[in-house]
Amino acid sequence: MQLILLEKIANLGNLGDKVNVKAGYGRNYLLPFGKATAATAANLAAFEERRAELEKAAADRKASAESRAAQLAELEVTITATAGDEGKLFGSIGTHDIADALTASGVEVAKSEVRLPNGTIRNVGEFDVAVHLHAEVEATVRVVVVAA
């Protein structure tokens, strides 16, 4: 399935690229979320007319993400959780908890932007958490988990 990308997609292409993707990925993700359009002659012409507008919108999103990344770089978030004697938490700290703590600190972060590659946090301590704000912008936040 050939599509024209309407925004930068990680590991796929940039705005305006004509890409070949599997039909399911195109129909179930890229097209419904407005990230791409079918690569027909009419859509190519319409895209070229809107190219400047789309590039400006993409630049605005990236600038916004970079400003949020600068704010996040300065933050250190402390989360309190109940823990046992050896520092093992009763439960865990997930992406939702971290996103809520960052939002409470003054920087709006969605749960889907927080990346925990090793799974949820289950121990007391300091952790560096990646926050993926844009396809080209990622920030690292120090999260301190303390026992209640």
From Swiss-Prot:
Protein's gene: rplI
NCBIfam families linked: L9 (TIGR00158)
Source organism, top-level taxon: Bacteria
Tagged with keyword rRNA-binding: yes
Alphabetically ordered keywords of this record: Ribonucleoprotein, Ribosomal protein, RNA-binding, rRNA-binding
Protein name as catalogued: Large ribosomal subunit protein bL9
Gene Ontology biological-process entries: translation
One GO CC term, this protein: ribonucleoprotein complex
